């Protein structure tokens, strides 16, 4: 039986070998007919080969430059750093992390300061190529960039994402600089720059277009790094895919926070990791014009206390068309809202050259450059400010009042996508109002009362939860900062023309009764008779101003002035011109009497217990005709 089984066993082995070879051949045919898609490494390498190193971006296939800032407690709440020392006090080995964890706090209590910070570097994960192909394109054909793209409506964040996804990541912008700018040759020895881009769920193509625009237009010798700060984005594409993409771009680093910091906190985080001489804070939906960086660095190299910004051109959110802006200055109003103001014809003629730097009261928040050490030594951003609103006002006031200056440079141009007004990602109104209160309490000195008069709800909120600005006021004294009246007199006098500035302000006290002028009406106060009431710091209605125009302004959102009807003092709309203007003129005498200029009579409080209204009477100097304001403003403060 054994001789019969052996041939059967040999045939079985031969059949198995033939079957194995057949399967191998089938597999090879399948691979040849259906090759796998190129890897990310191959795709990016092929893309890079289309561009020269001088004009394009270079790639580095080393380790991913990604840092994750970790805290044990997770959450989407906005939070600045508990226990994190002020930026000015950080040492080089402490500029690592922006979110402190409970474990770190326990370490700090043991006496080692560095233990308050965790710094974790993660290897990047494999990216999602299907999502990548779905949400962005990398066409770089110049002709395709001229294709007419159909505008669509805005997404929830106010951007036309479908149109943006169809637009090439790299496109040539129209030349909008003045011809003299093209004759400028950057000098050698300019400082290096760290460009900090903070984002939260930014559209993928918009973010990458900003990154490549910087890489393509900034000289490599001057660009120290681009630091991307992910402020807890939730989009999947901004996680693993972005990590892999950034890993292959030279001089681009990615920082992630696992707690929502807001724009101010995220910019602070990027600043702590930056190594360039100059910090350039830029929104993550910009495109840079060639030659945008050199003028910024040149002006800062000449004076490290300068805070500078490019001309901000407009990229339409509907069509993504790039439009040049005329020369503007950044200004503000008494509600502490930022305003663009066109440079007038006379102001342009006063410039030494069409490309001369423009002094600006306020720097725009879209793109701003500042020397890194100057930023540190002047306290960086105010840690009390939340999210991202009004930080440009704080930086501008600090620069002007503490020995620096603010400029907009015509030869530096950067386009910015201004989101649709229907965007749902605006800052919380109450948070924005709190930021304004902090700035008013910190920088406006006595002029904060004017701010509160324009926003009564801010006055009410400040009484409920007044911010503790002690540390910032100490910083002002340490830096030897000027007061806000210097800003009004020397930087932006248009905000407060001399004849509108108060000679006296605050509560108007009647010497005879020890009470204050007030309006007791509810609702509409137009025509309200003025009366006496117990003095209170919590009543905005008692905050008055006597101006250089001899008006007595009422402390409310409306511009109302003391007027006279039938011998009684009432509130009426302030008159700017015409004969009726004299009806609202009051002369405040040194002896305390307030004389109505048109009639020559004095303002007097009623002496009856049931009637404390204000009337006009013949001047006789009795105590019911004597008044005083809380504050007197010398001429040099007006």
UniProtKB/Swiss-Prot annotation:
EC number: 2.4.1.41
Record: residues binding Mn(2+): 283, 285, 416
Cytoplasmic side: 1-12
Chemical reaction(s) catalysed: L-seryl-[protein] + UDP-N-acetyl-alpha-D-galactosamine = a 3-O-[N-acetyl-alpha-D-galactosaminyl]-L-seryl-[protein] + UDP + H(+); L-threonyl-[protein] + UDP-N-acetyl-alpha-D-galactosamine = a 3-O-[N-acetyl-alpha-D-galactosaminyl]-L-threonyl-[protein] + UDP + H(+)
Glycosylation sites: 573
Domain of life of the native organism: Eukaryota
Tissue occurrence: Specifically expressed in testis.
Listed GO CC annotations: Golgi membrane; transport vesicle
Bilayer topology term: Single-pass type II membrane protein
Membrane-spanning ranges: 13-35
Major subcellular location class: Golgi
Residue ranges of the region described as Catalytic subdomain B: 357-419
CDD domains linked: beta-trefoil_Ricin_GALNT15, pp-GalNAc-T
Biological process, per Gene Ontology: protein glycosylation
Location of the region described as Disordered in the Swiss-Prot/TrEMBL record: 134-157
Residue stretches making up the Ricin B-type lectin domain: 503-630
Locations listed in the record: Golgi apparatus membrane
Cofactor list: Mn(2+)
UniProt keywords, alphabetically: Disulfide bond, Glycoprotein, Glycosyltransferase, Golgi apparatus, Lectin, Manganese, Membrane, Metal-binding, Signal-anchor, Transferase, Transmembrane, Transmembrane helix
Topological domains, Lumenal: 36-638
Stored InterPro entries: GalNAc-T, Glyco_trans_2-like, Nucleotide-diphossugar_trans, Ricin_B-like_lectins, Ricin_B_lectin
UniProt family annotation: Belongs to the glycosyltransferase 2 family. GalNAc-T subfamily.
Biological role stated in the UniProt entry: Catalyzes the initial reaction in O-linked oligosaccharide biosynthesis, the transfer of an N-acetyl-D-galactosamine residue to a serine or threonine residue on the protein receptor. Although it displays a much weaker activity toward all substrates tested compared to GALNT2, it is able to transfer up to seven GalNAc residues to the Muc5AC peptide, suggesting that it can fill vicinal Thr/Ser residues in cooperation with other GALNT proteins. Prefers Muc1a as substrate.
The protein, known as: Polypeptide N-acetylgalactosaminyltransferase 15
Organism of this sequence: Mus musculus
